[in-house]
Every structure is written in structure tokens, then in C-alpha cells.
């Protein structure tokens, strides 16, 4: 924080300011100079290392003060009246945030001392408790004779390859990787000391009663919540579009799942769970069809969906008749920092009488933290001792302290006006990108990409899905139930019309995503004719423009019918003899024809309309696997057989068949959908779908694991 911004209305600095700058620079500070209010604000938006703002009387007023506060309400601001300035001070125009210094009364050294003390106070204020304690510990440079064995990186420096590794990451990474033996830093497992302060700080930031830092991802956070909330022998309501970590919970614990069935549209975009699925009548009916099921004690709902659809969570919290609800919100840790998400989150609002609400966040996914950083938030009466046992069961006794600090810093970054600005900038950038795609489409001489969104996106808000709208492609939409997040942008490629019907020609989206990947642009998810991109706080204008440029480049190459070798070099290298002289339009039409052959839109609806039959719960199926009571079966032959592993294609990574389930004639469209994915990969090298739980054989066929008859 050595950068200082000086705002002065005169291009030519007076002798006093020149002298002050010289004194500051001798103290190691770098001075940025702005000559008007807009330039001051531009500097502040683009240089987060500015530790203080100095303004002369001729440039400062109350309006500028309010604009600075809106950007960063913690930043120290000084109004200087230089010794060579005779302008009288209008204290009514100064504002309440800034500190006035009449430089006639102080030496340069005194003024610099005031500025430096303010910067130190600013740094102290914005640094959260655990991170502050960790920084202080590293500064002390203590000698240790405990773990970790690299001893602040010293061990790496004794080896050539270790030195390369050390130099790549830098010394503070290793100095801050320390043992749990350091009592002054408390304990993550015991939630004591600075670790406890960090979790209390995070809870305050996210409007929770309790928050827990999880250092091995939301996959683990989900299991911790489930192990606490659902005792063995109980029944749990669970979103069928759940993350596979929740399937792993079902495999670990002997509990009975009853599935809440969401919708999908012709694009394969995951829809929400209809309101009727949450009613007592429908839940009661479900229980009669599941052997051993009792009234559920807990519910798990994915919010938002992978594709960015939020629920009206206030209504679900008030009406769903269970003791606790877990909103798996791994993909939306930013929702507490913009009013557009009010009423659509787990931690929003007050406690719900006689219920405990859990919300899990993948801090690393769309905030700024190291990979695997996650949080559990709780609202309601929690047995903290029992929860702590479930937490310790899944938490390492040697947590990586830099990851703990990054989780806390991610929360700190979102506090106050700075966090609101980060969030607003992301929202504005996402909506601007959406509009740019629509503008290009409107002016295109032939085809162009489209965006999955309402016609009018002028207002930055979560757009409600209405039954009368056609754009979303879902059937039977409930009023005031589902909302689209502006941050998650789904691009559409040609191939499906607005009614969800297949067109004669098409450009399957995996061609585009592979093209983008060859150019260093990685998308989040690719469906048959859709691509999901995320406008997180780390996306800037340069990245957004790079994506737009790459999309335009693909269109140009496609329209010119360039060779596959030119457009998709890595795909070409998968099988040069197959792709020799093949053109991109031929490849696109080939994959599109296979999709048409299987009538994908109808297959999508059918495959997720009837679930497989649960013969045993996932826990029992996994126990049989551990005992070796399973065997291989070709994928196409699995009708009528009990599946041993979960089967899920990537994308989207949502289980289609759970352990212990059987595909019947009624649910056979699920198998047909999987076979279609396999057929595309068999026909076109480089386009194989990764199907977890199905194993590709040398002959190109797939095998799955089934329970022995």
C-alpha cells in the first residue's frame, strides 16, 4: 500500500507540493498525480494498492468525497491546503469523510507522519483477523523443529528441483505454510483463536449465525452438513440434479433418498424443481414408492442450478416441512453482495422458526480464494459440539494456512462499498456482454450466436421465468419461483429453434468450445447447442473482448468452410487420417445429424421424466461393491440390472443413474441418451464424452458395474 494518489487541479505543481512529494518518495511511497475528479476516480478503480488520497482545495468537494466513499469507504482521504494557497476553506463543502490539513501549521515530516499513520490504520482495518495473525507470525521469522518438513521452504533450497519449485511460488507461500503446533494462531479443528475470529468475521460478512472454513472443497462441506443433519436410518429429500458429492454422502451413510425431480429443456439446460415437488401431498406420494422411507428430516436443494437459475428461497424456507434445509450454493458465493439476489439465497433474511438453514459456498469458484476453499454457513439453532464432530471427521489435522487465509480474505474483499463495487462491475460487464452478442446477431448477414435470456435485459436484475415466455424452453413454470442470474451467460449455437425443434443444419456447441480452448479460452460447460461462461469478479474487459473476438473468428472460419485442421488442430491430431481434407461444416453437420437421428429434444424430456427404480439405497449398493459382489456389464445391456456406481456424463456432472438403481423399460430413455453420447464419440474422434461410471473398452463399447444377480 505504498501508492499515494495526489489530486491537484493545476497542471503545474507548486513548490510546497513538489517538496511534499519528494519527502513521501524518500519514505518509499510512489505518487500518482491526477488533475481532475474523473482522473482521481479512474485511478481508484484501477489501482487497488493506493493507500491514501491527497487532494488540494481546488479539486475537492462533497460530491467527490461521496464518490470516493462509494468506491472504498475505508480509504483515508486528506484535503491539503498548501502553504502557497490563499483560498479560504468552505467546511460545508468538505464532507465528513476526509481529514483537513492546513499545511501552514505543520512541517512536511509531520504531514507525512499523519498520512503514514492513516495508511497503517487503513491496512489494519481491512486485514481480517486470521490473515493479520498469520502475517505477524511470518514477520517474526521463528525457528521451528516441528512440521511441515520443508521448514519455511529451507528444505527446498537444498535441492535443484526444489529451488525451482521455491522460486516459482515465492518465499511467503512457504513461510506461511506452518504447523498446527503454533498456538498463537489457534486451531481450525477446535475453532479457537484467530481461526475462530476468522469464522466469526465470515459469518458476519455472509449474514450467518455460524460459518465454518472448509479447506477441501464444497464436496466435503456438503458431506459435513449431511452427516450432521441426517442420522443413519433417516430419510432425506434431495435434488435429483445434486452434485456428485451428495451421492457420495448417500454411499457413505445408510440413509434413504427421496428425490425432488427438476425439469430440463430441449437444450439440456437444468431447470428448477417445480413448486408442487415441495408440497406435503407430493412428498407423501413419493414416500409410498420408496421402500423403508419415512418422513424426511432434511432437504438438499441446488441453488442456483448449474446454469444460473435461482429459487425463491424465502418461500421454500417457509413452506417445506423438514427440520433443516441445505442450499448447495457452491456456484454463487457472491449473492450477499448485491440487492438483486434478495430472497433468493439461503442466508438471506432472518431465522426461520424451528428450522436450521445451511448454505455451502465454493469460495474459490467465483470469489477470490485458492482452489478447494469453501464455506459452510448456518442460520438457526445448531448443536455446535455435534456439528464439530462431523466437521472434524472430514477435516485434515494439517490444514494449509494460506488457504484458510485466502478464504477469509475472499470475505474481506466483499465487505463494504468495495465489495459492492466488485459485484456491480461484474454484473454490468455480464449484461454489457449479453447485449453485445445480441447486437452482433442483429447485424449478422447470416447466423450468429444467441444468448439464453429474456428479450429485455436493460435492467440489472435476476430475471424471472414466466410461463408465457418462450425463451427459456421449460414447461409449467411456476410464478415467482425461478430467476436467471445475469452473471451466468449461456451462449446458444444454431441447431435448435425457439420452440426446441431441431433445425436442418446446426453447429453443435462442442465445436465452438474446442475452438475456444485451442485459443486459451476455457468455458465452464458445453451442452449440445449451448455454452456456459461465468462473469466472475476476476473477469475484466480484456477477457470479455477476447471471448467476443474468438467467437467472431470462429464464425469467419465456419462461414469460409475452413478445414478441420485449421479450425480445430487438436481434434485433427486425434485422427489425422479421419479428418484429412474434412471441412468444418461437414464435421458440424455430421454431429448434428447424429443428434437429429436420436431426436435429442424429445430424448432430453423423456430421459429425465421417469427416474430409474431404486432397488436399494446407494449405501447398500456401495457395501456390496466393497464386498466384491459386482460384475461388469455392457452399457447397452444394463436394463433390468442393478447399477453399482453412479453414472454421470460431463457435462454437466449430474448423476443420471444412482448406485442401487435399475433402468427399466419405462426409464430406458436415460440409456438411449447415454448411448447417443457414446455414438458421437465413436463416430468422431476427439468428441468422446467423459461418462463417470462407464468405462470405454478397446472395441469402443462401454461397460458399467452392476450388482451380481
Range-by-range predicted roles:
Residues 6-7, 80, 148-150, 239, ...:
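Short hydrophobic segments within beta-strands
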Residues 4, 12-28, 35-55, 68-76, ...:
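Non-catalytic terminal extensions of PLP-dependent enzymes
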Residues 172-220:
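Conserved N-terminal alpha-helix of the aminotransferase class I/II PLP-enzyme fold
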Residues 24, 34-46, 56, 62-69, ...:
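Conserved PLP-enzyme active-site core in the AAT-like
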Residues 2-14, 236-239:
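Short hydrophobic beta-strand segments
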Residues 78-83, 326-329:
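ADP-ribose/adenylate-binding Rossmann-like module
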Residues 212-214, 299-302, 531-536:
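Short glycine-rich or small-residue beta-strand-to-loop segments that form or flank ligand, phosphate
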Amino acid at each position: 500500500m505504498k501508492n499515494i494518489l495526489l489530486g491537484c487541479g493545476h497542471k503545474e505543481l507548486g513548490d510546497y507540493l513538489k517538496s511534499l512529494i519528494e519527502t513521501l518518495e524518500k519514505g518509499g511511497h510512489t505518487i500518482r498525480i491526477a488533475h481532475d475528479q474523473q482522473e482521481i476516480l479512474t485511478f481508484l478503480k484501477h489501482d487497488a494498492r493506493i493507500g491514501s488520497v491527497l487532494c488540494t482545495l481546488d479539486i475537492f468537494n462533497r460530491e467527490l468525497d461521496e464518490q470516493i466513499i462509494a468506491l472504498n469507504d475505508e480509504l483515508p482521504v486528506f484535503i491539503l491546503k498548501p502553504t502557497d494557497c490563499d483560498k479560504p476553506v468552505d467546511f460545508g463543502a468538505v464532507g465528513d469523510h476526509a481529514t483537513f490539513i492546513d499545511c501552514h501549521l505543520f512541517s512536511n515530516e509531520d504531514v507525512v507522519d499523519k498520512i503514514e499513520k492513516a495508511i497503517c490504520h487503513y491496512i489494519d482495518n481491512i486485514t481480517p483477523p486470521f490473515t493479520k495473525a498469520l502475517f505477524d507470525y511470518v514477520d517474526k521469522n521463528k525457528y521451528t523443529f516441528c512440521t511441515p518438513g520443508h521448514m519455511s521452504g529451507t528444505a527446498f533450497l537444498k535441492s535443484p528441483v526444489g529451488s525451482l519449485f521455491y522460486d516459482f511460488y515465492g518465499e511467503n507461500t512457504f513461510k506461511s505454510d506452518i504447523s498446527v503446533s503454533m498456538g498463537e494462531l489457534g486451531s481450525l479443528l477446535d475453532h479457537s483463536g484467530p481461526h475462530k475470529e476468522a469464522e466469526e468475521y465470515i459469518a458476519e460478512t455472509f449474514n450467518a449465525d455460524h460459518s465454518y472454513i472448509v479447506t477441501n472443497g464444497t464436496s466435503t462441506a456438503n458431506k459435513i452438513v449431511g452427516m450432521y443433519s441426517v442420522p443413519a436410518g433417516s430419510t432425506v429429500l434431495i435434488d435429483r440434479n445434486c452434485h456428485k458429492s451428495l451421492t457420495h454422502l448417500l454411499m457413505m451413510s445408510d440413509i434413504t433418498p427421496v428425490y425432488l425431480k427438476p425439469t430440463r429443456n430441449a437444450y439440456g439446460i437444468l431447470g428448477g424443481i417445480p413448486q408442487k415437488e415441495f408440497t406435503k401431498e407430493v412428498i407423501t406420494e413419493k414416500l409410498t414408492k420408496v421402500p423403508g422411507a419415512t418422513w424426511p428430516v432434511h432437504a438438499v436443494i441446488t441453488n442456483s442450478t448449474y446454469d444460473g437459475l435461482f429459487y425463491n428461497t424465502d418461500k421454500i424456507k417457509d413452506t417445506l416441512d423438514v427440520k433443516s434445509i441445505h442450499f448447495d450454493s457452491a456456484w454463487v458465493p457472491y449473492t450477499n453482495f448485491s440487492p438483486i439476489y434478495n430472497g433468493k439465497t439461503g442466508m438471506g433474511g432472518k431465522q426461520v422458526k424451528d428450522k436450521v438453514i445451511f448454505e455451502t459456498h465454493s469460495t474459490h469458484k467465483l470469489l477470490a480464494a485458492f482452489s478447494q476453499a469453501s464455506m459452510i454457513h448456518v442460520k438457526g439453532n445448531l448443536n455446535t459440539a455435534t456439528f464439530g464432530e462431523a466437521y472434524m471427521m472430514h477435516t485434515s489435522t494439517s490444514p494449509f494456512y494460506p488457504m484458510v487465509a485466502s478464504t477469509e480474505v475472499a470475505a474481506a474483499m466483499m465487505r463494504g462499498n468495495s465489495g459492492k463495487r466488485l459485484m456491480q462491475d461484474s454484473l454490468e460487464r455480464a449484461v454489457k456482454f449479453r447485449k453485445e452478442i445480441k447486437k452482433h446477431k442483429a447485424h449478422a448477414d447470416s447466423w450468429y450466436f444467441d444468448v439464453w435470456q429474456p428479450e429485455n435485459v436493460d435492467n440489472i436484475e435476476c430475471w424471472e421465468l414466466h410461463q408465457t415466455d418462450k425463451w427459456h424452453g421449460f414447461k409449467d413454470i411456476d410464478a415467482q419461483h425461478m430467476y436467471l442470474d445475469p452473471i451466468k451467460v449461456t451462449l446458444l449455437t444454431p441447431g435448435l429453434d425457439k420452440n426446441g425443434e431441431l433445425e436442418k443444419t446446426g453447429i453443435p456447441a462442442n465445436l465452438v468450445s474446442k475452438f475456444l480452448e485451442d485459443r486459451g479460452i476455457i468455458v465452464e460447460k458445453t451442452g449440445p447447442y449451448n455454452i456456459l461462461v461465468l462473469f466472475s469478479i476476476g473477469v475484466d474487459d480484456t477477457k470479455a473482448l477476447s471471448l467476443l473476438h474468438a467467437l467472431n473468428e470462429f464464425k469467419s472460419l465456419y462461414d469460409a468452410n475452413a478445414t478441420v485442421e485449421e479450425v480445430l488442430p487438436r481434434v485433427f491430431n486425434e485422427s489425422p487420417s479421419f479428418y484429412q481434407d474434412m471441412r468444418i461444416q461437414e464435421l458440424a453437420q455430421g454431429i448434428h445429424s447424429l443428434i437429429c437421428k436420436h431426436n435429442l429434444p424429445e430424448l432430453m424430456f423423456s430421459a429425465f421424466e421417469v427416474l430409474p427404480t431404486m432397488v436399494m439405497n446407494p449405501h447398500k449398493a456401495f457395501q456390496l461393491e466393497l464386498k466384491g459382489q459386482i460384475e461388469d456389464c455392457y452399457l447397452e445391456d444394463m436394463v433390468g440390472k442393478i447399477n453399482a456406481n453412479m453414472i454421470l456424463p460431463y457435462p454437466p456432472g449430474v448423476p443420471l443413474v444412482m448406485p442401487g438403481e435399475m433402468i427399466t423399460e419405462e426409464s430406458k430413455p436415460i440409456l438411449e441418451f447415454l448411448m447417443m453420447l457414446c455414438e458421437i464419440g465413436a463416430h468422431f474422434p476427439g468428441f468422446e464424452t467423459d461418462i463417470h461410471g462407464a468405462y470405454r473398452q478397446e472395441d469402443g463399447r462401454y461397460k458399467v458395474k452392476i450388482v451380481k444377480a
